[in-house]
């Protein structure tokens, strides 16, 4: 009976919730970094170094987006940098919101190319969740916030 009671308990600030939040943030951030950010960055570097056609820029141009190369670079940098900031929990809400916008473009890109957008949709749902939740207890956001609160109290005293 004790196991059943524990499994039904709702503790939004309990240890399990905090560790779950950390796991969600780190795993999603690493997956977006690896699958979206790093892959796009490698394509951009190959384009810059060797003039190799950059698939992403071509697909963005096919979407009739103004300045497709600049848009592809922006999407690449957002997915590369913001995902790493999410992993460490730094400015989590801002980075998650930026990633949600970039992933919205990935959803559209997949739909227009007749590909399954399911993975991009799933990542978008996770980062939108992080917009609402923030970085959590085990994040740099929490550490910075705690330090700011301590300094505020010291200055007030």
Walk through the language-model features, giving the residues of each.
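Perimembrane loop-to-helix junctions flanking transmembrane segments
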Residues: 47-66
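Extended, low-polarity transmembrane helix blocks
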Residues: 1-47, 66-77, 81, 88-157
